């Protein structure tokens, strides 16, 4: 089977969140048995220099583009450049729209940029003559509408990674697209008087998935549908929740080259202690006791991730002996609060603004617990990384966290600490339970349960194969 994925993110080239990790690990697994391609923008600052093959693909104009328009002009000057990564063929969209960017998101005209990128992805799918076209999130959703309206549509799948981001904008911002004979702004795009790419993707795709069964259920009702639950209900029969997986070559304490000391189930205590000692030296906190529980937090400092609730709970439970290492960036107020705590309580709290892949691995390996107080979480990957690294996750009971972390009364099944509702009292009580667990013999059983879990893509790839088959049968 020939599969083309279209995405704004792909690790390690354009990573802003879990989408990049998910797609890189999924396609790596798929490439073992299928012919896999990925289309992504070529921005000015990539996380890694691609392994270019020298092959290029041009002529990106859809066959029915007969008039000279802005979109046609931009596509005529663009091309895809091929590279290889872990057996996957990557097609970087080389266009003046993206070449000057240091970050894939955040531009005022990003709706315009991703509209043109979606045109190009649609054209590439026709050129490569793939069997399945798989688009990810709103950035590539317009390509699904083009597929649906094509005289030769390709079976398609749309994966929703985060319904909170919908690519909605005033119609005038991409009004120029009305001029193109192969693009029509019609009712699928209209949501509350705005052009909504996510809605168009949901209504246009042959099949729809999201990244956990729990998040699928949540998005079928408001407020978790962010205004689109009624659209998803229309496609409920075609909507599937499939948990993400992780790459065992990338996230595995047995072979991780980014951590100070590799370890496994039989020596996890020794391994984590050495990694904790190394991390404290690296962040300038060499005098912190290794016998105190360390809690790691990694993520974008956004409303979704629940950091304000954490701050409230932390201040109310500051008598607990926990130490914290936080890696992330985002909301300025949250950043300032974390910097303040880091300055005022240096032996208790450390904050690194930004994202650092090596530090992320070191935090997972060194921490005793990993906190995810998300208000909603489509899937989450860090709780899976934490399981593999013997780092007990403390999570809110939402979305994919609910599907993957179990605070069972039966010690044989316990794989973390879960709290609800998501407020300072519930989170504070969860922190107290973590403190008790840290010194309890029960901790050994929990870590064993976690490190024996299988979060690889082997089973999940088969679930995607099943959905691909349904999409193909719809067009036969």
From Swiss-Prot:
Pathway: Glycan biosynthesis; glycogen biosynthesis. InterPro entries: Glyco_trans_1, GS/SS, Starch_synth_cat_dom. It comes from the Bacteria. NCBIfam families: glgA (TIGR02095). It catalyses: [(1->4)-alpha-D-glucosyl](n) + ADP-alpha-D-glucose = [(1->4)-alpha-D-glucosyl](n+1) + ADP + H(+). Keywords: Glycogen biosynthesis, Glycosyltransferase, Transferase. Gene3D superfamilies: Glycogen Phosphorylase B. The gene is glgA. GO terms for biological process: glycogen biosynthetic process. CDD domains: GT5_Glycogen_synthase_DULL1-like. This is Glycogen synthase. It is an enzyme of class 2 (transferase). It comes from Leptospira biflexa serovar Patoc (strain Patoc 1 / ATCC 23582 / Paris). Belongs to the glycosyltransferase 1 family. Bacterial/plant glycogen synthase subfamily. Synthesizes alpha-1,4-glucan chains using ADP-glucose. ADP-alpha-D-glucose binds at residue 15. GO terms for molecular function: alpha-1,4-glucan glucosyltransferase (ADP-glucose donor) activity; alpha-1,4-glucan glucosyltransferase (UDP-glucose donor) activity. Its EC number is 2.4.1.21.
